[in-house]
Amino acid sequence: MLSKYELIKPDIGSSHGNITKVYEIVGGKPLRGQVKVSGSKNAALPVLAASLLCKEPLQLTNLPKILDVTNMIQCMEALGKRFEFINTNTIKIGNREMDTLTIPKEAARQIRASIILLGPLVAQYPKVILPLPGGCSIGKRPIDLHISALNALGVDIVELPDCLVCSRRYARLQGNTINFSIKTVTGTENAMMAAVLAEGTTIINNAAMEPEIVDLANFLNRLGAKINGGGSDRITISGVDKLNSCGSYSIMADRIEAGTYLVAAAMTRGSISVKGVNPDYLVAVLSELKCAGAKITCDSDSIQLDMGEEYGESLNITTKPYPGFPTDLQSLFLSLTCVLRGNSYLCETLFEDRFQIVQELKKMGANISLKDNTAHIKGVSRLRGSQVNATDLRSGAALVCASLAAEGITQIFAIEHIERGYEDLILKLKALGANIKLIENTHVTSTELSDSHFKEATSSETRIQRASLIETIVTPSITTFGQFKRVPTGEVTELEKQQTPYLHHIM
């Protein structure tokens, strides 16, 4: 087997006993130069999942070299896919025969996006058992919307404490109308991937409108799907019998990574050009950067930012589904508002725990108070270096930006969160003039550095991971467990255990 997903596995920052990896950043130097954006994490993961629907070889290019992609590949290899890397960012995907399809539990529990394997799996197999996903600890991200959408297409689902047990009612999924009560990106993606092989027509109302949805629709249509309306709030899908190879497909650029470098340049009073990104996907973000004092100019595939010598006035931001301000950049702009003049307000409407970063920024001298889902920030003249912990992917990136602007030295721990979603972060920042390095074998434990807030965050993540210690199996038999309902483990019948051989291991 020529699969070498370790080629895209980055050096991750983690703690093993007394050995810790950290980012060390000396702040105060403006970022200047050009940076090219990598392929989008949030587009690559659903496109990889969608490749399960095609039994013919195909090739993906512009695949980001990040840990989430590595974990997704590990999951998909266990589901019968064969991966061969042509180069670091290009992968050839094929198939191999499998007697038992079992996802490695370690990979499944590390990645929130494992939930989007459900759509393509139930489209092809009569029964699927999927572990509840892991990922960043940023609050509740209920999967009820995924379940209700698949239920509408003919999937009966029982949610156990550790997994979902899914059974098709019919030999083939049935097209239907899906009405999402709120917008959900991964829920929309799951519904799309399931519906492309369903019998009849599926209409998704209140669909997510993100550019990554458009990218997935484009990929599926290249495979022979019939999807109309991707990028609007109403998507129509006419089911087909099978999908065929498109040859090669290029993953779209990462607009969140682009926003990250723009914020870093703004915070350091720098001047950079971000290449390879469509500025139309960042309209709300660029508007706020202009309000913060940045001069912005755009070409068709690049964005130039010049911050000048002075920070701008305060911001008032509310996160919203696309095309509104993205929640994935909320933490970054929280860092930015710490150094702006005046009082800023940041309201988070999508995730209740996006403010875990506040305690870390306070260590650096930030003046932030929280009330409900809103942060009130009073700008300070300068942040100062400290020892901080990345509690999730985007907060980690935000701490990097804050450290680049701070006076003195900052050490960032738990950098494995950052490496989940950023390709070659250190190399790209160094090319812009940043003083940043990875320090290994530092004999300091995270416990010695963390406060009670971080302990709660890490213990919460541990509980999430512990709850996901179950592998995923696809079995050949059809078993109906009834309509979706939550049931305690003890209510699963002996017959259901026998029909799903793996279930008895988790009872």
UniProtKB/Swiss-Prot annotation:
Catalytic class of the enzyme: transferase
Catalytic site: 136 (proton donor)
Reactions mediated catalytically: phosphoenolpyruvate + UDP-N-acetyl-alpha-D-glucosamine = UDP-N-acetyl-3-O-(1-carboxyvinyl)-alpha-D-glucosamine + phosphate
Binding site for UDP-N-acetyl-alpha-D-glucosamine: 112, 141-145, 328, 350
GO biological process: cell division; cell wall organization; peptidoglycan biosynthetic process; regulation of cell shape; UDP-N-acetylgalactosamine biosynthetic process
Disulphide bridges: none
GO terms of molecular function: UDP-N-acetylglucosamine 1-carboxyvinyltransferase activity
CDD domains named among the record's database cross-references: UdpNAET (cd01555)
One Pfam family it belongs to: EPSP_synthase
Residue ranges the record marks as coiled coil: none
Main location: cytoplasm
Protein keywords: Cell cycle, Cell division, Cell shape, Cell wall biogenesis/degradation, Cytoplasm, Peptidoglycan synthesis, Pyruvate, Transferase
Positions carrying 2-(S-cysteinyl)pyruvic acid O-phosphothioketal: 136
Pathway(s) of this molecule: Cell wall biogenesis; peptidoglycan biosynthesis
Family that this chain belongs to: Belongs to the EPSP synthase family. MurA subfamily.
HAMAP family: MurA
Function: Cell wall formation. Adds enolpyruvyl to UDP-N-acetylglucosamine.
Name the UniProt record assigns to this protein: UDP-N-acetylglucosamine 1-carboxyvinyltransferase 1
Organism: Legionella pneumophila (strain Lens)
